[in-house]
Amino acid sequence: MARMGGQRRLKALAAPRFWPILRKEYKWAVKPRPGPHPAEKSLPLLLIVRNVLGYAQTAREARKLISEGHFRVDGVVRKDYKFPVGFMDVIEVVDTGEKFRMLPYPVKFFKLHPIPEEEGDLKPVRIENKTTVKGGHVQLNLHDGRNILVRVKDPRNPVEDVYRTMDTLLITVPGQEIKGHIKFGEGAIAIIVGGRNVGRVGVVKSVQKGWGRKRTLVTLEDASGNLFQTSLDYVFVIGLDRPVISLPEGAWK
């Protein structure tokens, strides 16, 4: 009989290149569970605990710590060691109070960046698309799988819907209360979340529209005045006058 569904296991050699694992030492790697982020843009919680934070030496130790509820992701205790952690997620070590944000980073693709206490319950999320639901209300579909409902009084004139695709919302986690709205456009500060310019931060200078998001070209200028280009699909706006989140030293002015 033919196999139905996907593989439940993942070979280390087939894991994404940016995963911090010893591919030639171990045959198998932890396969992320389906969740808010795709496997090619996330790290399983076990790898973060063991390989990045160094709180465990073995997978068994990491699974034990996770199952005991020592780690929160976006304000929620996660006990599944396969839970996928991706861009902009906030990881908290419950016992120490340490908080980190998962940021895109050059070459390594991901970096756990320490953040201050006041930033720990805030998260920027990108609007991927919008849908109209029953009653004429607008549902915002975000990059991490979340949905936020914008209620409108008159579906024929939805003045409450001021949001556009590719805009960024600053929300609380886990409450999902909207605290800020950053519009995508020229003059906005953005961080690149994919491609060869991953992790670079710059100001949007121009947008050359193409067929679809991936073929639309965005030109940005970094803090040193250097211009670079990338696909619109990789652009994640994080501020107007200044970034709304803390960044690694040297990433911005």
UniProtKB/Swiss-Prot annotation:
GO cellular component: cytosolic small ribosomal subunit
Keyword entries, A-Z: Ribonucleoprotein, Ribosomal protein, RNA-binding, rRNA-binding
InterPro entries noted in UniProt: Rib_uL2_dom2 (IPR014722), Ribosomal_eS4 (IPR000876), Ribosomal_eS4_central_region (IPR013845), Ribosomal_eS4_central_sf (IPR038237), Ribosomal_eS4_KOW (IPR041982), Ribosomal_eS4_N (IPR013843), S4_RNA-bd (IPR002942), S4_RNA-bd_sf (IPR036986)
GO BP, sorted A to Z: translation
GO terms assigned for molecular function: rRNA binding; structural constituent of ribosome
Protein's UniProt keywords contain Ribosomal protein: yes
Residue ranges of every copy of the S4 RNA-binding domain listed in the record: 43-114
CDD domains: KOW_RPS4, S4
Pfam families: Ribosomal_S4e, RS4NT, S4
Family the entry assigns: Belongs to the eukaryotic ribosomal protein eS4 family.
NCBIfam families: PRK04313.1
Name this polypeptide is given: Small ribosomal subunit protein eS4
Gene source species: Aeropyrum pernix (strain ATCC 700893 / DSM 11879 / JCM 9820 / NBRC 100138 / K1)
